[in-house]
């Protein structure tokens, strides 16, 4: 069973994302309320997927994603955030984030995204978007 780590400062969001990951076939092996322990958790668990919020206490998720991918380029990261500024999205794309899922998201769509991101590593491409979609009804901005 593929494994996942959830990093989000909201306990409610961690619970919701955890349930969606389980529906997508993942086992949640660790959770954190900020990105400060991300490197340590990744090294300990080597998950198949990481979900990461951007706006959290301490380091922001975009910076943490860039740091993790610089050290572990094989890490698969999905950003789950309500922040849809083009500069943060571009930082995440340059860092190699696989997908940028905007909150609030449709649960069925999120499950689909988690499954597709895992399959993406098996050469099934995600769709490409030219513009950042509004955060409603299950929008995601995959890596180009």
Language model feature labels by segment:
Residues 87, 105-118, 122:
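C-terminal output helix
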Residues 112, 119-144:
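CheY-like receiver
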Residues 63, 84-101, 112:
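Alpha4 helix (beta4-alpha4-beta5 surface) of REC/receiver domains from two-component response regulators
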Residues 11-30:
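Two-component/phosphorelay signaling modules centered on CheY-like receiver
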Residues 45-51:
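Active-site beta3 strand of CheY-like receiver
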């Amino acid at each position: 069973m593929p494994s996942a780590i959830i990093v989000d400062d909201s306990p409610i969001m961690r619970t919701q994302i955890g349930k969606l990951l389980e529906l997508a076939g993942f086992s949640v092996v660790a959770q954190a309320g900020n990105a400060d322990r991300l490197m340590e958790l990744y090294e300990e668990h080597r998950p198949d997927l990481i979900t990461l919020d951007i706006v959290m206490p301490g380091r922001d998720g975009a910076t943490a994603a860039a740091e993790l991918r610089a050290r572990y380029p094989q890490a698969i990261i999905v950003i789950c955030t309500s922040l849809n500024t083009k500069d943060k999205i571009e930082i995440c794309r340059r860092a190699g984030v696989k997908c940028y899922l905007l909150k609030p998201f449709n649960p069925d769509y999120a499950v689909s995204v988690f499954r597709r991101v895992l399959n993406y590593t098996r050469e099934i491409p995600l769709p490409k978007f030219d513009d950042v979609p509004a955060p409603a009804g299950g929008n995601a901005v995959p890596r180009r």
